[in-house]
Amino acid sequence: WLDLNTEEGMEYWIGMNLAGEYASANHHQIHRRIAKALETKPVAVVENHHNFAWKEKLANGTEVIVHRKGATPAGKGVLGVIPGSMAQPGFVVRGKGEPTSINSASHGAGRVMSRSKALKTITKPELKKVLADKGVTLIGGDLDEAPMVYKDINQVMS
């Protein structure tokens, strides 16, 4: 337990927020470069901040810290992204503001295989074939993020 009213707690909170701002700035830079390469402009920017903590108020007015590990904010009307995998689509969603989920939604399809097991069992040629069959060119990522380690996003979203 880390008390955010202590010096250490305040330092942690500031550091975590700086890391979040850094990640967001990097995503904006990636999006800007993609838009430039495609000679277009984004119609909207949707953040998918996850594995992060926020100060929020519950329905009863209690202020709490919500840490969303594997989840993303989904307050009423808030736009979000639920990614699939390297070979499946992602979904742009609008939050329902469901209090029983603390205004949160899944950050993705969910794993069916751990990172360590994926690194031990999936080969690079196997990954390349799966992606080639889907017409996907890999420019980043590793075996622990291979499409076969995730649930089918279409089933998850239905």
Model regions: which residues?
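Domain-length cofactor-binding catalytic modules of enzymes
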Residues: 1-158
